[in-house]
Amino acid sequence: MPLNKDIKKVLVIGSGPIIIGQAAEFDYSGTQACQALKEEGIEVVLVNSNPATIMTDKEIADKVYLEPLTVEFVEKVIEKERPDSLLAGMGGQTGLNLAVELYEKGILDKYNVKVIGTSIESIKEGEDRELFRDMMNRINQPVIQSEIITDLDAGIAFARKIGYPVIVRPAYTLGGTGGGIANNEEELIETLTSGLQLSTIGQVLLEKSVKGWKEIEYEVMRDSFGNCITVCNMENIDPVGIHTGDSIVVAPSQTLSDKEYQMLRSASIDIINAVGIEGGCNVQFALNPHSFEYAVIEINPRVSRSSALASKATGYPIAKVAAKIALGYGLDEIKNAVTGMTYACFEPSLDYVVVKIPKWPFDKFQGADRALGTKMMATGEIMAIGSNFEAAFLKGIRSLEIGKYSLEHKKFKDLSMYELRERVVSPDDERIFALAEMLRRGYRIDMVSKITGIDIFFLEKFRWLVEEEQKLKQSTIDDLNREWLLKLKRRGFSDKAIADMLKVSPDEIYRLRDIWHIKPAYKMVDTCGGEFEALSPYYYSTYEQYDEVVVSDNKKVVVIGSGPIRIGQGIEFDYASVHCVMALRKQEIETIVINNNPETVSTDFSISDKLYFEPLTEEDVLNIIDKEKPDGVILQFGGQTAIKLAKFLKEKNIPTLGTTSDQIDLAEDREQFDDLLERLNIARPKGKGVWSLEEGLEEARRLGFPILVRPSFVLGGQGMEITHDEEELTYYLTNAFEKDSKNPILIDKYLMGREIEVDAISDGEDVLVPGIMEHLERAGVHSGDSITMYPAQNISDKIKEDVLDYTKKLALSIGIKGMINIQFIEFEGKLYVIEVNPRASRTVPYISKVSGVPIVDIATRIMLGERLKDLGYGTGVYKEPDLVSVKVPVFSTQKLPNVEVSLGPEMRSTGEVLGVGRNVFEALYKGFVGASMYTGDKGKTILATIKKHDKKEFMELAKDLDKLGYNFIATTGTAKELREAGIDAKEVRRIGEESPNIMDLIKNKEIDLVVNTPTKANDSKRDGFHIRRAAIERNIGVMTSLDTLKALVELQKEGAHNRELEVFNLI
């Protein structure tokens, strides 16, 4: 039992949905913390709204409440479960803010709940900008000249006093939300207004900019006895001015002198002692590159994105140790699981280099402002480990899955030196490639350092890489000798990069490596620089001499992970990968994971028998397979990242378990799939590929509007749009053919029907459908952005029978062994198939949890040769539960300047929440609350701007809203129609007309909800785009689908928002 015998039942608060600034790292830390508590015999009650997480599984906590993370709902959980303690530091900013709110509202005192780990007072001192600054002054730690600002005028006055540029840092926000650098008064007014609105306490720190100084981070641990260690220090390659979440980070720091390192280490320990942290803490410093002057930027008094990175970089389990400290243990009493000999008070040492590179979502948001600053915009990140910086860096580049294997980027070749300089001085997500092009053209390193703030050490490394690339380009395969190839491999060059530059195939380089015996060795991440023997089977590749992998003769399977979190491929696939690993280990099969994401549970070395932290490219995966010689490889759970390796592995005669490469092709190739549907007599929306505007218009006239148009090769609905008439179609096709005239545009009849989705399991003979899901928004909204209901609420028994029949026919005809995801449309009483994915999908965690069927476990056992009828869950459609569960998408568009907000065929959500209720209205209300959507609880003024095709339907909803007490503001046309329908509506002027116009009302927050159905989504020149953006940036609700608005109307008519709602333990 723990040292503190009073702790028997602990409430752990999770971090909620994945959003920019708060991603999978909190599932990793939360899972680790829950396991650490259970190890001590403590009952764990978890509350988290995100169903896609491992931490909300029944194996991780004793009680799981998938409920909204609000004071109201968490109080209900506390009242029902009566925990004696609360662990707040594992749920990111969300968990921290909620713990402070529960404390300040007296709820923790009311139920006698003690906060364990870092106290509320210490959290406040770390998070409140004024308290933190005062504390730093008391302990003589330098802070940047700053002022706490709570109103605009005071901010302007302070900026005039200290001079521009200034940095705006809102209190209690996530990922720098609402903040930024202001170079002049006009920019300050805009940024400060946003920051004050988005801070939960209306407080902003305005500070003198030290843009260009080095940004250094220390991850520190402290126990309640005052023992303190630094786990890891990290250096941002990008200087201060770019959010650390958007910076390339290297560990350990590469450019600090011993004096600088020790100076900042001592400062970190002084700060963590002064604040009174008990657990983990991240300290960020700005360091003047020309002197020993430094300043404390901020601390995070909790586990964070950086602590997940530090954990994976060192092998030191920060969240687990923090949880043990919260129970009263000292660092000298907690065993290091990696070595099994040393204790947590032993500081890790690294004999390798780790590089983290962010993964940005700009492929999904073509019009987005890509400029990087103090507001975080990355959705995820990759980590790479190498025996030198260059090797780790190049591994990182190829791990990003952006089609780059070196520092060369075609788009920068034609830019002038002036244009390149502009791209480097005003950094964006592609700056590193522009910088490499400057070095390629001979730009002096000292000048590049001066204009970028990047240390000469890193620039010299980049220059060496660029020079080697140039040498290769000027050579042939005959010039390549063993010595040169070995040098290139040691510095991280992939076979593909070398082959591309020598204009040969990667197989040719692989063949030479085989002849010359140039094979990677695998080293262990051991926390102690080889000083003690390690037990952890956690490896990275290097081309040095000694190999530390022990290859067994056991039956073994490789599981390919899903790589970095990005829109369309999120934490759901890590969930599936981890469950696959658990299922294999239960069958006593040696399980090997390959992945490169430092935020996830799958890259926790305790999850699998062996973990290879490597890029998910053909070469890197093949090297591991060559080494381990597994009995099979599983690709089904790693999303598109894993599936796209299927063809390559087949060519290399490597067995994949479950569905084969040919079967994947059958499902994903449009022509083959259309032939299959015809043979099976299954309908799909009519359509074809067109090559010109004229052909497109002719096909549209044949099919009849509305029409769904999209490029022929897309993922995640990229570039899809619904057009309602010839004018809209002409606009789309003209732009599409201008961008790409070499591929056809697909034109399908758009069926405005109900979308239905299933995740099914097949063993080649039978099929099990754990549940039939219904989408709330009609077809045309990407399935990942739709509200999803289970059990389905509006589907007839006849359609359910057809769903099962079509699922069976498709799964058995394709030859699925394992998982299949199918999306249907029900239109005018008939069922159509719109998409088949021969793998796990993003709905797997949701349907697993709410149906009670362990989908991934069953699918994995089928891949190993078992049959559905022997696994205890039957076949056909599984029985429906009593409770209704609604999955609601969550968006991060507020954090991405100039991106589209409206729902459509292209996926934009970053995460999801679950709402569980006795009926669909209760579940929807909880889902809306959990997703921070508009619920009508705070204000009832609606701005309506509705396109002509939607006006008739909107008028019916407006009548209901009018009866519910809503007020309407509308532009001339809509206002006139509302009045004609007997609804009072205030008229407002359009954008660009004299004040007060629409924009004035939004800026003054005189509107509570914007209902805007877009005429042309993604067109940033149109009024609708500006209205949606202005509203979302001011935390005003926006609905662009009348189906979502109808759901709001129905739950209000049912009074779900006024009921005393229950909370449900899903175990």
UniProtKB/Swiss-Prot annotation:
Binding site for Mn(2+) 1: 284, 298
Region (Oligomerization domain): 402-549
Gene Ontology terms describing biological process: 'de novo' UMP biosynthetic process; glutamine metabolic process; L-arginine biosynthetic process
EC number(s) reported in the record: 6.3.4.16, 6.3.5.5
Keyword line: Amino-acid biosynthesis, Arginine biosynthesis, ATP-binding, Ligase, Magnesium, Manganese, Metal-binding, Nucleotide-binding, Pyrimidine biosynthesis, Repeat
Catalytic activity of the protein: hydrogencarbonate + L-glutamine + 2 ATP + H2O = carbamoyl phosphate + L-glutamate + 2 ADP + phosphate + 2 H(+)
Quaternary organization: Composed of two chains; the small (or glutamine) chain promotes the hydrolysis of glutamine to ammonia, which is used by the large (or ammonia) chain to synthesize carbamoyl phosphate. Tetramer of heterodimers (alpha,beta)4.
Domain comment quoted from the record: The large subunit is composed of 2 ATP-grasp domains that are involved in binding the 2 ATP molecules needed for carbamoyl phosphate synthesis. The N-terminal ATP-grasp domain (referred to as the carboxyphosphate synthetic component) catalyzes the ATP-dependent phosphorylation of hydrogencarbonate to carboxyphosphate and the subsequent nucleophilic attack by ammonia to form a carbamate intermediate.
The name this protein goes by in its record: Carbamoyl phosphate synthase large chain
Binding positions (ATP 2): 710, 749, 751, 755, 780-783, 823, 835
Domain ATP-grasp: 133-327, 674-864
Residues annotated for Mg(2+) 4 binding in this entry: 835, 837
Binding of Mg(2+) 1, residues: 284, 298
Residues binding Mn(2+) 4, per UniProt: 835, 837
Top EC class for this record: ligase
SUPFAM superfamilies linked: Carbamoyl phosphate synthetase, large subunit connection domain, Glutathione synthetase ATP-binding domain-like, Methylglyoxal synthase-like, PreATP-grasp domain
Annotated binding of ATP 1, by residue: 129, 169, 175-176, 208, 210, 215, 241-243, 284, 298
Cofactor note: Binds 4 Mg(2+) or Mn(2+) ions per subunit.
Source species: Clostridium perfringens (strain ATCC 13124 / DSM 756 / JCM 1290 / NCIMB 6125 / NCTC 8237 / Type A)
Gene name as annotated: carB
Positions with a binding annotation for Mg(2+) 2: 298, 300
Carbamoyl phosphate synthetic domain: region residues: 550-932
Metabolic or biological pathway: Amino-acid biosynthesis; L-arginine biosynthesis; carbamoyl phosphate from bicarbonate: step 1/1; Pyrimidine metabolism; UMP biosynthesis via de novo pathway; (S)-dihydroorotate from bicarbonate: step 1/3
Binding site for Mn(2+) 2: 298, 300
Gene3D superfamilies membership: 3.40.50.20, ATP-grasp fold, A domain (3.30.1490.20), ATP-grasp fold, B domain (3.30.470.20), Carbamoyl-phosphate synthetase, large subunit oligomerisation domain (1.10.1030.10), Methylglyoxal synthase-like domain (3.40.50.1380)
Annotated GO CC locations: cytoplasm
